[in-house]
């Protein structure tokens, strides 16, 4: 058996992509080795290919050297699903970052797109504006700057009620078969040739004609079922969750267990819409609103985002810089800002200085005036539960009539119709909240042990959606942040733990409570290295990756080659 030579592998990789795109030292690999919220480990190298052919060649080199490959696009995941975790791998680990492969190809007059591995949702949204269409997800990813393929591979949900999880049955990907051989699978529905070199080069250069694009009515480029599923408000199961076997297909839900080169996706017609802001001190009000709007409008609501007052307050203070940055510079620049902050943090940590940038940003924003509209602030003070609702204009009159009549009878809440600025800021505030718990932790290290972040899908008929924790658990928590995609009954629940409490123990206690409620988790952030993959999901991973060469160990599965079983 040939002896493994790290230097020989690195030299081969450098010959493929160039020396500057093979990173090996701890500081330059830091932003690729660490998750945004969770996960970290050692790597042999981070490789950043510049073409699809280079991506294929890097993959060949990695498999030839018997390395584990972790595919990574934007690294905005929240469960460590695109970074290494721990140091107990049985083979060297390579991270392949696809951030340079940003190609987006518009086909069928904008009704569909083909996205390469590094394409971002923000860029796709900008391109589709010229066609008066939208991607599956608009600004609404927990970490702005998320990639299109990351969403598909982790069947991410998002805020848009009608669209469900990111999903396609049309993809171009590579997998390692049970004999350990690398294969390229072209299920993109585009005739591109026969050899990997020809297929990948022609795709990247868009060297195909309209006649080469195949339209098979049996193959979907989006989830056609969800708009029906979400309206079934009396069903005793969640509308969507990561381990749903009916939404796992090749690249969709693959979580890096294959190497994806491109996906083909439907786009969506842009519609004129209006935003309502709803506040209440009775959770039953929001339940009644959800059930009515999902079943009685001319068209499904576009979005319905829930914010608990405690999450509102933490987000207002500790998500302020994110909010203001996006307001000033737009979403396209957020990844650059994160990368710059990460480099500064990495440099300072060499001198044992941790969290300085967070403290500085908090100090700056503390002295800036309030960034949220006056009417939202008034509702913050009056109401515990908040719902930001967007409906198509053909449903606006009926929605307003219902809310007016409802709150005439139920004095526990109220609503207002947002101006364009209020609506935009309300949704942006909701998304800034998602990172606020991290900022709170990083600026209160002496008080905070860590964060337990849960991503849950409740049953569609569950009326008891406000969590009641046992007193024994409550006393270990400094703050609870509840927010989420209310009409989908998907909630994000961040618990900021007091110093001295074990986050893992607390998380496992939370899981037992969720099991008792027959909730599914994770709902849309995928298992990463945080959650346990349920049998259907673990079996899907093993089928895709029989040698266990890709993204090893996710979902608490085996980190061993061939899944720890004898080679068949």
Residue ranges and their predicted role:
Residues 36-38, 42-44, 72-74, 79-91, ...:
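Conserved glycine-rich FAD pyrophosphate-binding loop
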């Amino acid at each position: 058996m040939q002896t493994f030579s790290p230097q020989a592998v690195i030299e081969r990789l450098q010959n493929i992509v160039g020396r500057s795109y093979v990173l090996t030292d701890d500081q330059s690999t830091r932003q690729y080795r660490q998750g945004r919220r969770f996960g970290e480990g050692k790597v042999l190298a981070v490789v950043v290919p510049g073409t699809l052919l280079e991506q294929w060649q890097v993959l060949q080199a990695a498999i030839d050297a018997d390395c584990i490959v972790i595919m990574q696009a934007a690294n905005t995941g929240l469960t460590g699903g695109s970074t290494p975790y721990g140091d107990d791998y049985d083979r060297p680990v390579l991270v392949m970052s696809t951030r340079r492969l940003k190609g987006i190809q518009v086909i069928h007059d904008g009704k569909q797109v083909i996205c390469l591995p590094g394409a971002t949702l923000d860029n796709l949204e900008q391109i589709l504006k010229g066609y008066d269409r939208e991607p599956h997800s608009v600004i609404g990813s927990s970490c702005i700057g998320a990639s299109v393929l990351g969403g598909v591979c982790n069947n991410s949900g998002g805020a848009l009620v009608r669209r469900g999880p990111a999903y396609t049955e049309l993809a171009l990907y590579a997998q390692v078969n049970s004999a350990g051989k690398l294969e390229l699978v072209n299920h993109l529905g585009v005739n591109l040739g026969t050899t990997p070199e020809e297929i990948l080069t022609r795709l990247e250069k868009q060297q195909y004609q309209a006649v080469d694009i195949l339209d098979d009515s049996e193959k979907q480029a989006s989830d056609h079922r969800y708009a029906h599923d979400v309206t079934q408000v009396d069903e005793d199961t969640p509308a969507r969750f990561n381990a749903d076997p009916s939404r796992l297909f090749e690249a969709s839900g693959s979580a890096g267990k294959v190497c994806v080169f491109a996906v083909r996706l439907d786009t969506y017609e842009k519609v004129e819409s209006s935003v309502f802001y709803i506040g209440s001190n009775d959770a039953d009000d929001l339940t009644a609103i959800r059930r009515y709007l999902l079943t009685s409008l001319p068209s499904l609501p576009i979005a319905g985002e829930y914010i608990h007052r405690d999450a509102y307050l933490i987000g207002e203070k500790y998500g302020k810089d994110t909010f203001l940055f996006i307001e000033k510079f737009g979403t396209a620049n957020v990844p650059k800002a994160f990368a710059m902050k990460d480099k500064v943090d990495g440099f300072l940590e060499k001198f044992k200085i941790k969290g300085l940038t967070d403290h500085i940003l908090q100090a700056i924003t503390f002295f800036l005036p309030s960034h949220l509209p006056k009417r939202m602030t008034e509702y913050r003070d009056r109401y515990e539960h908040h719902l930001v609702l967007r409906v198509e204009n053909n449903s606006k009159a009926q929605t307003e009539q219902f809310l007016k009549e409802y709150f005439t009878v139920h004095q526990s809440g109220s609503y207002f119709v947002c101006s364009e600025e209020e609506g935009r800021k309300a949704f942006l505030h909701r998304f800034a909240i998602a990172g606020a718990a991290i900022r709170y932790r990083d600026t209160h290290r002496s008080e905070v042990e860590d964060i337990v972040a849960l991503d849950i899908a409740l049953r569609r008929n569950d009326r008891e959606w406000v969590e009641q924790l046992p007193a024994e658990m409550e006393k270990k928590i400094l703050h609870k942040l509840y927010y989420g995609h209310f009409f989908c009954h998907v909630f994000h629940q961040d618990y900021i733990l007091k110093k001295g409490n074990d986050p893992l123990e607390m998380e496992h206690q939370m899981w037992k409570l969720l099991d008792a409620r027959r909730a599914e988790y994770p709902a849309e952030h995928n298992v990463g290295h945080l959650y346990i993959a349920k049998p259907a999901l673990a079996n899907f991973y093993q089928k895709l990756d029989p040698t266990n060469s890709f993204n090893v160990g996710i979902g608490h599965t085996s980190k061993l080659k061939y899944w720890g079983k004898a080679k068949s």
